[in-house]
Amino acid sequence: MMIKQLPENDKPKEKLIAKGAAHLADSELLAILINTGRKGHSSIEVAQDLIKMARSLKELKLLSLNDIMKVKGIGLNKAIILKAAFELGERMYIPDLDTKVKITSPQDAADYFLSRMMHLTHEQFEVLFLNSKNVVIRHEVIFVGTLNSSIVHPREVFKAAIKWSSNAIIVVHNHPSGDVTPSKEDILTTKRLQECGRVLGIELLDHIIIGDAKYLSMVEGGYFDD
C-alpha cells in the first residue's frame, strides 16, 4: 500500500506531528528520510527492506553508501541523506569536549561511553586522558578490531597521553557479544598498561569493558595489581 492510500493518522509525517517521533516505528522514521517509495511499494516498505538487509537497526550505521543503494528505491541522494542521519545519531552520544567532565568513579567513566559504544558491532579500544583533577582533557580511539595485547601496545597509549599532558588515563573497550567478562587478553593488556604507567608516572585508573547496556570496571572486579 502506498503512503497516500494510508489513513491520514497512519502516514509517518502526519503521525509524527500528531503524536511525536517516539510513537513511530523504526521503519516509519526511516520512511520519512527516504521520502518516496518505488513503483508499487511505499517508502515504509523500502525502509523495511533496508532494515532487513542490515539485520538490525544498530547495524545501519555500518552500511556504506553502496550497501544502502542495493535496496531498490534508494539512489545516491537518498543514501547520502540516510548516511548523514546515521552519523548524526552516532555523534549525539559523543560528549562535548567544551564541557568539563570530571571522572570520580567507574560509573562516570562508563557513562561517558556506554550509550555510544554498547551498540558497536566491532571491538573498539579508546582512552580517556585526564588532568591532575581527573577532568577529561580528551578521548581518542586507539584501535579498532579484536583486542590483542600484542596489537594494543602501551607505546601508542602513552604516546598520546604524553602528547595531551595527561596525569592519568582510563582505557575503555567494548565486547560486541554483550558479555563484559574480561578475556585473558583483556587482563594481560591491563597489566602491561599498569606497568608502563608506573614507569612513566601516568597512572592507569581503570579499564572499563562495555557490554550490552552494562559495564565492568576491572578495578572494582579486582583485576588490578595493588
UniProtKB/Swiss-Prot annotation:
GO MF terms, alphabetically ordered = metal ion binding; metallopeptidase activity
GO biological-process terms attached to the record = proteolysis
UniProt cross-references to Pfam families, sorted A to Z:
RadC, UPF0758_N
Positions binding Zn(2+) in this chain are 173, 175, 186
Segments forming domain MPN: 102-224
State the UniProt keywords alphabetically: Hydrolase, Metal-binding, Metalloprotease, Protease, Zinc
Residue span of motif JAMM motif = 173-186
> What family is this protein classified in?
Belongs to the UPF0758 family.
Q: What is this protein called?
A: UPF0758 protein Sca_1264
Source species of the chain: Staphylococcus carnosus (strain TM300)
